[in-house]
Structure formats: C-alpha cells, structure tokens
Amino acid sequence: MDNVRGSIMLQPLPEIAESIDDAICHELSMWPDDAKDLLLIVEAISRGDLKLVLVACAKAVSENNLLMARWCMGELRGMVSISGEPIQRLGAYMLEGLVARLAASGSSIYKSLQSREPESYEFLSYVYVLHEVCPYFKFGYMSANGAIAEAMKDEERIHIIDFQIGQGSQWIALIQAFAARPGGAPNIRITGVGDGSVLVTVKKRLEKLAKKFDVPFRFNAVSRPSCEVEVENLDVRDGEALGVNFAYMLHHLPDESVSMENHRDRLLRMVKSLSPKVVTLVEQECNTNTSPFLPRFLETLSYYTAMFESIDVMLPRNHKERINIEQHCMARDVVNIIACEGAERIERHELLGKWKSRFSMAGFEPYPLSSIISATIRALLRDYSNGYAIEERDGALYLGWMDRILVSSCAWK
C-alpha cells in the first residue's frame, strides 16, 4: 500500500483536504465545515477510499454527529467484505465496532461480544493455525524461552509461572531444551493460570511430553482470572529458581485509569515480592489504553492494517479457516477497542516505553536479551515473508511488518 497515501488517509478530515486540488480547497474554504466534509466523503466513496470513509465515520461518531455517522455506515456496508482485500476485511470489523458504539455502551456491548465466542477448544484451534502461519507467537515464545533458559542454565529446581498459559505450546520447546542439558534435566514445575477445562488438557499434554523426554515435571493449575490471582495460589517454594511469564496478557488487566484497584501494577508488585530470577514480557506494540476515542480508532486502523496485510501474505484468502481465525483471534479485539469504554474495554495495549515505566516502578531491573536469541529468531523469519523484520534496541526485541512494529519482547529481574 502506498505509504504517502496511507499517511494522508489517517489524518483528520480538515487536514485531508490539503491533498485535494488547490482550486477545490479554495472553493471548500467558503463552505460550512459539514458541507466540506460531506464533499470529501463523497469523493472518497467514488474512488473507493475505504480508509478515509472509515475515519470520517469515526470522526462523526466522536462528535455525536448521528446523521453523518449513519450515512457513512450505510456507504461502508457496500465497501467492506470479510473475504476481500485486507483493508476490506479489517474495515468490516471496524464498522461493526462503530455500529456497536453508536447503538449501545458498557456491559450490553461486551455481553454481545461474549455471546459469539467459540468454545475454548475451538478458539485454541484457531490460535494454533495463526501460530503456524504467522511468526507473532513464535517470536514471543522463543524470545521469552531464551531469556528463561539463559537465566536458569545452572539451576536444578525450576518453577515457571505462566499467567496466561493458553494451550501451553510455549513450554514444549523449553522442556525439550532442558531435557538436552548436559548432566541431565532439572526438576521443572509449571504453574499455569487459565480456563479450568483447558488446564486439564494442558496438564496432560505437558506431563506426557516431559515423560517422553525423561524430565522430572509437575504442573500446578490455577483456574481463575489473572487479576484475581494471589500469592497463595502460586505454590512458590524455597529452593526453586522462579521464572514468570507475561506473554500477551498484561494488556487485559485494568490499570489506574479504569479502577482504583489497578490490577496491572498490583500484579507486577506481587510478582516482584516473589523474588523471581527472570520475568518475561511480550506485548503488542500498540497504544490503545488511555487514548481518547478518535486517536484510538486511528491507532487501531494503522496497527491492524499491518496485521491483516501480513496474514494476507501468509494465509491464502480461500483458506477454509482464515475467516474464523481473523474473526475470533483479532476481530473481537478490534470491536472491543472501538465499541467499549471503562471496565468493559479489556483490550488496553501500551507501548513498551510505558511497560518499562511500570516494571521500573514495581522495582524490576532490565534483563537484556542476548544476541543469541535475536540470531535464532532472525533464522526463524527466513521461513516467512521478507516483509517481517527484527529490530534489537535497548535490550529488547521488536518484530515488525514493513514499517510498523507489531510486537515487543523484553525481560526483567
């Protein structure tokens, strides 16, 4: 996609006018603002400029201009498609978010989103396919595992706490790596926080793997939301080297802007009190936590455009699961970011700079990722599109698509 055109399209409507013929702009300057906006939108529709119409609709919603918003929504319905170009697919879900925002608020929106969730096993199957075709999960898991393996290289008793264990896929490679350690594998305990029904499957899966590779292993299941986890749930024991993993989960915790309880910082302080040897953080490099609605919409449009374009390269449009993957792994996030506010908006991403501030305030110090980890991940990316790139900066790793950073990874102690 043309970068110059893309940057113009992400500007507010009065600034977009600068890209139009000078004569038209002069004429528009004599018109009321609503008339100017309307003409710009009509021109955007006629040339199929979906991004501009999306931004115009979001601007109308933010200004509570119901007539303009509903007219834009009607036009957008004829421009978006869940089986079209990346921007058409993303546009379909962003439109859904705008409609939901205009129609309702708070818990009613969140409940309507929840009602469309697939069963846990079904959702995890979609995540698995995404894991295989795009490097986002592998990047995060490999960088975190590398930091944990390095920190634990001389330890004989290891306890890893994963605050969002999912399928437990991250730990397969690490268990195998520990099994290959000269002199024998260490004793490993993994505490997994997650959905109770899934934890049973994860426990059996990891126990079977550990037995196959002759690794002493135990699994501790914590079936409760991460924000409700207390020290006594984690079964931390003396004599065990502790590692803690926060992979794609801290952004789900409400911070001080949502609740006085501030679970985001509370959890970090609690983990610091356990004296872990290493703590790993993997997060989407996106700024949607405290931003007002319109800037948040623009950031979401920019970020997920890159995400959908990268998936389009790796997963054919006729792939039978692609729509399900996009709908359940990303679209729900997009709709939540756009439609919801307050406690009902659970997708609250922050940039790594803000995460660094939070970790520092909780008493952590950086644990720089080694060059070996970045070299390993660079080798991994050879299996994917050359549109992906790795950047190593200030002890952290960044994964990007074209000129947009999508994921960051770092470690702390």
Swiss-Prot record:
Keywords: Nucleus, Transcription, Transcription regulation. A motif (VHIID) lies at residues 158-162. Its main location: nucleus. Residues 201-233 are annotated as: Leucine repeat II (LRII). Residues 41-413 form the GRAS domain. Signal peptide: none annotated. GO terms for biological process: regulation of DNA-templated transcription. Residues 242-336 are annotated as: PFYRE. Residues 127-192 are annotated as: VHIID. GO terms for molecular function: DNA-binding transcription factor activity. Residues 339-413 are annotated as: SAW. Residues 48-108 are annotated as: Leucine repeat I (LRI). This is Scarecrow-like protein 21. It comes from Arabidopsis thaliana. The gene is SCL21.
